[in-house]
Amino acid sequence: MPQAIHISPIDNVVVALHPIAKGTLVEVDGLAVTALEDIPQGHKMAVKPIKNGENVIKYGFPIGHATADAEPGTWMHTHNVHTNLSGEVEYSYNPSPDLAPLPKVEPETFMGFRRKDGRAAIRNEIWIIPTVGCVNDIAKKMVADNQDLVTGTIEGLYTFTHPFGCSQTGHDHAQTRKLLAALVRHPNAAAVLVLSLGCENLTHEQFLAELGDYDHDRVKFLTCQDVDDEFTAARDILKKLAAYAGQFKREPIPVSELVVGMKCGGSDGLSGITANPTIGRFSDMMGQRGGSTVLTEVPEMFGAEGFLMDRCIDRDVFVKAEQMINGFKEYFISHNEVVYDNPSPGNKQGGITTLEDKSCGCVQKGGTAPIMDVIGYGDPVVTKGLNMLYGPGNDLVSATAMTAAGAHLILFSTGRGTPFSAPAPTLKISTNTPLAEKKSGWIDFNTGVIADGEKTIDEAAKDLLDLVIRVAGGEQTKAEKHGFREISIFKDGVVL
């Protein structure tokens, strides 16, 4: 079993695949270094002398600079490494010389649902979407009272509550409206009840305008203040929606029609070595099959955005990526926040030292394929291949944004563990085997086998594709079995 990994030949650190005790001789890639102190799993150890102020190199890229001289064998972390990041950057388009679509592969099929508008779906559910937080508990009771309608091919009745829809203004209000309308359009929802109170800022007329053309059999509306008994009214509506949803049956659909979101949260020092590269290889495999993948978490691209921007398929896509990256930095600056106020305490405990360190691991989920499009918050994926989406690093907010963009399911890598799930089925992918064993009720797929030397990234990615096909065909994720699913909306404005 390997002790450590030397990710790039030019790196001056290695990453411990397992805890390394002080005095242990570590041999990797022709290097032989004795650990001068204990090195926790996922953490970095110097394998070359590093001077004060010299860059610390990992993934072949500077992840910060040393704040003290370090001899080979030194533990390199927050006590002796600091970020190099600052504010906005003027980027130039330097497309990778080998920028080209990956060779095509005949797509496999999964057993999914074909909607009347031609779109594919992997779940056949009825959703209740509240337009305002005031009706959250009403929506929950409607779900509880009508579980008998979940029969036949209907796979669930769910609501996604939130605290917004009123006391919002301007762009913040518009953003909420756009996100909720996007959820109503999601193909996994066979039928939708839009539930409002009646006096909120997000009016029925505004929501209809945002939603645009819709199938009146698939989407129904109920305003609680307009009826004597909202529960009786909801029962009548939900019966009609159930009759509509019950007509859909699973049938073979090519994998090329899948949209898969890619997310990491509770990351550790192995995220960029095991789970995220596996997801990246999966993303490339999806692109070869004509499918679509979505990468977001813009603040966690800071410091590594060059890896992605040089892969933009053309200058127009590059300009959109540049505007997205610098726009998010300006968002931080406008709130008097530093752009590099990341990683989290849990990330640091797991071995991630700086935002560059975290970002270099994060972008591994993007694989090697060209970036085909950059889309805004609440906008749908319309281009096949790898897409970048405007969204924060926050797990709940970014996963909700990917669902709203049309992701049928989400791949979520984690080194620390999390039970969270978006409305779209969310597969938890552990970076290390101890987590998979400890939290077997959370974890769907273990890439710790890569660190254990049992499988290669290519082998793990193929296994992951097989799992995705099964989940798309109806196999439940661990979170689905527990009934976990929720949303969080990107808030950027005052509360009236």
Segments predicted by a language model, with ranges:
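Metallocofactor- and cofactor-centric catalytic cores in central/energy metabolism, strongly enriched
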Residues: 1-409, 416-496
